[in-house]
Amino acid sequence: RDVLGSRGLGDVYKRQDREYLRSCAEEHDLPFIVHETSFDPSTDTRKSPCFLCSWTRRKALFEIAKAHKCNKIALGHHQDDILETLLMNLTHQGAFGTMPPRLRMDKFDMEIIRPMCLVEERELIQVAAWKGYRKQLKNCPYESGSSRSDMKELLRSLEAINPEARYSLWGSMTNIQEDYLPRKIR
């Protein structure tokens, strides 16, 4: 069963984007479900507002999918999103990890898939322009100056140094040479 989803938007733009998404869903004969979410960033100051918002929306997606007897959720993360997350985890968490193309969520008896994981953001922008899709308006108070926007800029800088940098970063996730990495010191 197919379900078309959207992420949270500010009130000013919400109606415009909602109607645009509704018309896209109708055009493709997909059900259109609206579910409002909210969060309070002061409830957990250890986590960034971006993480809390994302987790709140993701949890709602799991609940809605479960209610509609779905066992997979397809998310629109593209290659840039995955590489930016890798860079964020390396620089902010000291961890080598990112969003995998497939992730089994046993707690929710659900699988997340990311079918656009190999597509670059710039390619999606070109296809959207060619197909005449309207860009979704965002009104996130935390977006500018976020770690993700810093990582987007870092990825651009790495590509300026080496045009193949994104492909090297992508390949590094499956080419881990453990013999050449430090071991945990006891």
Predicted regions and their residues:
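Short, surface-exposed alpha-helical segments at coil->helix boundaries
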Residues: 15-22, 121, 125
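Short, well-ordered secondary-structure micro-motifs
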Residues: 14-16, 45-46, 85-87, 179-182
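ATP/NTP-dependent adenylation/nucleotidyl-transfer catalytic domains that generate, transfer
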Residues: 97-186
